[in-house]
Amino acid sequence: HRIALDPTPAQRIALARAAGCARVAWNWALAEWKRKYDAGEKPSFRTVQAAWNAAKHGLFPWLKESPKDANLTPLLDLATAFRNYFAKRAKYPRFKSKGRDVPSFGISNDKFRCDGRKVRLPVIGWVNTRQALRFEGRILTGRVTFTAGRWFLSAAVEADHFRPAAPEGSIVGIDLGVRTLATLSDGTKIENPRALRSAEKRLHRANLSIARKRRARDKALGPAKKGERRPIGKNLAKACKRAARVHARVASIRSDAIHKATTRIAATWTTVVLEDLHVRGMTRRAKGRGRVAKAGLNRSILDAGFGEFRRQLAYKLPLHGGTLVVAPRFFASSKLCSACGVKRASLSLSERTFACDSCGYSVDRDRNAAINLCTLGARGTHACGGEVRPGDLGRWAHPVEAGIVARAG
């Protein structure tokens, strides 16, 4: 659960100090890890922690002014980062910069507590929040982050509350799009808020302001040398914060719309069938004529958040006893006639109504694709709504994909 904090000016300084201490601890631990590795040793969390505890008070006596966990959690995060690196799930950890990385620090569950619309943080004290914690249960972890001029607390809560199961055996196909975020096979349409398009003018003005201030700075300082880091003045910092606030609002609107849609779908349907969209290929740059129009389409596709829509369904459906089925990437859901099954040779993006050349059936293009996805999932789902298994889908058979629950094709 992520809630916004409402700290006093003094508490803002204390929160920024704690985030700075966490950054210092991370950078020191990463340098120590690399030093031990270059010396032929096998660094670990325990060895780096022992070296940190022995050196921190002599090198950084001001660490005592911040919560203890702000200096400990970076070491745990670094150990996790190296595990992900060696498992080839992430890149090599890098040093954190004050201007580049998001200020944050972690707090263990026994160090803070919530009481209504306020939370008690160690050393900092009681901090007001914009809303109360929605979930009741044991708090597992907490992390305070600074985003677009606001402080947030993210708390993981072990909640044991009842989630109603979806009707048994219900199945739906979903076609994702730009104009309409999701079209369901039963005809339901979920509108796309298009948050980025509504904020384009404000974002354009903010970026112009940043560009003007950077040009003025570079004119005063002369040509920049290779690798030189230019200072950021107060006016430039204010302009960057204005742009960051616009981006944060766009992200919040998009996240809110997707959360509401996926929660309603997960509580209504037992089996949900999505197509495996190749977003990176869909948003590849065009060359020559039409590249400006393609750039606008790319922005709209990325603004819709197809990947986030699928990610949320993947973890919400099992909570309601449901299953997510992912159709094969090259399954022609838009070109197949949902009435007779005949595939059209071509279908342009401008054709919003599907008309079958064989049987004459006419239907909305997006709903036709959603019905085909629903039919594909029904062929591989038992009457009770179980998982799709190899062999159930004929030529579209494919092993079950771990982490996404099921894959069709």
What are these regions (language model features)?
Residues 46-147, 299:
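Acidic carboxylate diad motif detector
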Residues 1-5, 126-131, 189-192:
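Generic detection of short hydrophobic beta-strand segments and adjacent strand-loop junctions
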Residues 1-71:
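Gly/serine-rich nucleotide phosphate-binding loop at the start of the catalytic core
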Residues 2, 77, 102, 116-118, ...:
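Broad gene-expression machinery/nucleic-acid interaction feature
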Residues 13, 24, 123, 135-138, ...:
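Positively charged, helix-rich recognition surfaces that bind polyanionic ligands
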Residues 30-37, 82, 86-93, 159, ...:
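Long, hydrophobic, amphipathic alpha-helical segments used as structural scaffolds
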